[in-house]
C-alpha cells in the first residue's frame, strides 16, 4: 500500500491511498457490504452510479456463509462480487461479540456460537487473518478485544492487554506468511482499544504505533457513549498516532460524526447507517434528514434534495418514493440506498475539497447552518 499525506487544514487531512485494486483520497466513506454486497445494490451500482473506490465486507458473516473457501474458489472477494476496486474486511470480532449471546473472550481468542445454526467457533489472531487471506481483501483488520461501554477500569485494561497481545501475534504471523508468498499485496491495520479511558487509549496507541502496521484504526467507539465523549477520545488520541499512516474510525457514523472526526484527524469511516436508514424510509440531505413515509409527501412533486445529483434525485419525486415505501416495493430499497450513499460519498468529497482549500472551518459552519444549528 502506498500512502501520501497530501494536505492538512488544522488536524483535518487529505491523504492518498493506493492498494492493489484502486487509488482513493481521504476523507473516505466506505459503504458496508456485510455479506459481500451492499444491501440492494450490486457492483455496477457501486462503480457506475456511486463511484465508490473502496467498500467493506464482514469476515464473521462471510466466514460462516458461504465460507472463506468458497470465496477463495471464485478468486477472492473481487472475483466473487465482481467489484474490482478495493475491499476492506473487518476481523469479525465485533459480530462475534454482538451477535453471539454466549461469546467468551480468552487470551487465545474469541469463542462464539453461530447465529445461523448454533455451531461453535473460535476466532484467533491467526485464524481471522487466514480467512482474510482467502478473501484477498486489500485491507485486513486484526482481531481485537472489544468491550461494551460503560465498562469497568479493570475490564478496559484487560481489553487493551489482550488487543496488544493479539496485535503482536497478528503482525508477526502476517510477516511470516508474506515470507511464504501468502498475503502479498494485502495490508494489515491494527486496532486501538481502551474505551473512553485516556490512559488506556494512549497505552494501546503507543504500543501499536511501534508495530509495522499499514494503518491504525480506532475501535470500540459508538457503542453506547455520548457523542461528546467519542469526539474527545478521538481528539486525545491524535498526538499518539503516526501521521504517515491512515487513521480509520470503525463503525461511525452520522454525517455530524464524520464532520467532527475529520476535524480531529480521522481519514476513513464505515457505517451501515445510510443503507439501514434508507430501508426504514429515512433520507439524508444537505438540510438534515427526514422520513418519506409521512403523509405530507403523498403529492409532493419535488425530489428528495434539489442540490443532489444522484440517480434517485435525477429521476424520481418524493411522492413516488412515498408510494414505493408504503407499498413495500423492493425497488424502494435500491433508490433510497443509492441516494443515501451518494450523500455520504459526496459529503466526503466536499470535505476533501474544503481541506485542500484551507476552508474546513467555514465548511463545518455552513454544514451546521444548513441544518439550522
UniProtKB/Swiss-Prot annotation:
Co-factor: note: Binds 1 zinc ion per subunit.
Keyword Nucleotide-binding in annotation: no
Biological or metabolic pathway of the protein: tRNA modification; tRNA-queuosine biosynthesis
Top-rank taxon, per record: Bacteria
One Pfam family it belongs to: TGT
Annotated positions binding substrate: 90-94, 144, 193, 220
Coiled coil: none
Region of interest called RNA binding, as start-end residue ranges on this chain: 251-257, 275-279
Active site annotation, chain numbering: 90 (proton acceptor), 270 (nucleophile)
SUPFAM superfamilies linked: tRNA-guanine transglycosylase
GO biological-process terms attached to the record: queuosine biosynthetic process; tRNA-guanine transglycosylation
Keywords: Glycosyltransferase, Metal-binding, Queuosine biosynthesis, Transferase, tRNA processing, Zinc
Cofactor(s) the record lists: Zn(2+)
EC number(s) stated in the UniProt entry for this protein: 2.4.2.29
GO terms assigned for molecular function: metal ion binding; tRNA-guanosine(34) queuine transglycosylase activity
Binding site for Zn(2+): 308, 310, 313, 339
Gene3D superfamilies in the record: Queuine tRNA-ribosyltransferase-like
Record field: catalytic activity: 7-aminomethyl-7-carbaguanine + guanosine(34) in tRNA = 7-aminomethyl-7-carbaguanosine(34) in tRNA + guanine
A cellular component term, taken from the record's GO annotations: cytosol
UniProt-listed HAMAP family: Q_tRNA_Tgt
PANTHER family: QUEUINE TRNA-RIBOSYLTRANSFERASE CATALYTIC SUBUNIT 1
Record note on quaternary structure: Homodimer. Within each dimer, one monomer is responsible for RNA recognition and catalysis, while the other monomer binds to the replacement base PreQ1.
Task of the protein: Catalyzes the base-exchange of a guanine (G) residue with the queuine precursor 7-aminomethyl-7-deazaguanine (PreQ1) at position 34 (anticodon wobble position) in tRNAs with GU(N) anticodons (tRNA-Asp, -Asn, -His and -Tyr). Catalysis occurs through a double-displacement mechanism. The nucleophile active site attacks the C1' of nucleotide 34 to detach the guanine base from the RNA, forming a covalent enzyme-RNA intermediate. The proton acceptor active site deprotonates the incoming PreQ1, allowing a nucleophilic attack on the C1' of the ribose to form the product.
Family of the protein in this entry: Belongs to the queuine tRNA-ribosyltransferase family.
Protein name listed in UniProt: Queuine tRNA-ribosyltransferase
Organism annotation: Campylobacter jejuni subsp. jejuni serotype O:2 (strain ATCC 700819 / NCTC 11168)
Name of the encoding gene: tgt
Amino acid at each position: 500500500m502506498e500512502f501520501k499525506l497530501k494536505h492538512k487544514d488544522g488536524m483535518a487531512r487529505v491523504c492518498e491511498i493506493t492498494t492493489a485494486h484502486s487509488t482513493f483520497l481521504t476523507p473516505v466513506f466506505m459503504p458496508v457490504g456485510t455479506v459481500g454486497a451492499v444491501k440492494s445494490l450490486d457492483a455496477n451500482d457501486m462503480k457506475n452510479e456511486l463511484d465508490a473506490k473502496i467498500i467493506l465486507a464482514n469476515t464473521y458473516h462471510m466466514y460462516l456463509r458461504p465460507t472463506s473457501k468458497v470465496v477463495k474458489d471464485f478468486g477472492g472477494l473481487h472475483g466473487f462480487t465482481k467489484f474490482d476496486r478495493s475491499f476492506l474486511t473487518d476481523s469479525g470480532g465485533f459480530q462475534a461479540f454482538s451477535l453471539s449471546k454466549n461469546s467468551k473472550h480468552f487470551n487465545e481468542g474469541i469463542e462464539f456460537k453461530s447465529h445461523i445454526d448454533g455451531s461453535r467457533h473460535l476466532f484467533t489472531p491467526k485464524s481471522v487473518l487466514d480467512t482474510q487471506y482467502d478473501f484477498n481483501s486489500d485491507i485486513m483488520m486484526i482481531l481485537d478485544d472489544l468491550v461494551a461501554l460503560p465498562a469497568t477500569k479493570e475490564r478496559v485494561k484487560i481489553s487493551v492487554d489482550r488487543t496488544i497481545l493479539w496485535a503482536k501475534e497478528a503482525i508477526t504471523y502476517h510477516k511470516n506468511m508474506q515470507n511464504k508468498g501468502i498475503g502479498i499485496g494485502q495490508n494489515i491495520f491494527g486496532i486501538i482499544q481502551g474505551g473512553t479511558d485516556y490512559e488506556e487509549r494512549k497505552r494501546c496507541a503507543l504500543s501499536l504505533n511501534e508495530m509495522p502496521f499499514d494503518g491504525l484504526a480506532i475501535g470500540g467507539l459508538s457503542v453506547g457513549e455520548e457523542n461528546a465523549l467519542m469526539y474527545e477520545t478521538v481528539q486525545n488520541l491524535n498526538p499518539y498516532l503516526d501521521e504517515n499512516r491512515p487513521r480509520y474510525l470503525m463503525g461511525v457514523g452520522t454525517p455530524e460524526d464524520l464532520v467532527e472526526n475529520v476535524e480531529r484527524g480521522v481519514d476513513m469511516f464505515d457505517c451501515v447507517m445510510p443503507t439501514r436508514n434508507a430501508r426504514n424510509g429515512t433520507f439524508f440531505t444537505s438540510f438534515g434528514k427526514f422520513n418519506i413515509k409521512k403523509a405530507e409527501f403523498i403529492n409532493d412533486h419535488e425530489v428528495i434534495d434539489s442540490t443532489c445529483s444522484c440517480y434517485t434525485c435525477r429521476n424520481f419525486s418524493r411522492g413516488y418514493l412515498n408510494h414505493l415505501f408504503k407499498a413495500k416495493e423492493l425497488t424502494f430499497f435500491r433508490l433510497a440506498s443509492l441516494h443515501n450513499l451518494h450523500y455520504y460519498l459526496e459529503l466526503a468529497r466536499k470535505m476533501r475539497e474544503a481541506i485542500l482549500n484551507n476552508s474546513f472551518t467555514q465548511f463545518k459552519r455552513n454544514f451546521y447552518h444548513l441544518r439550522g444549528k
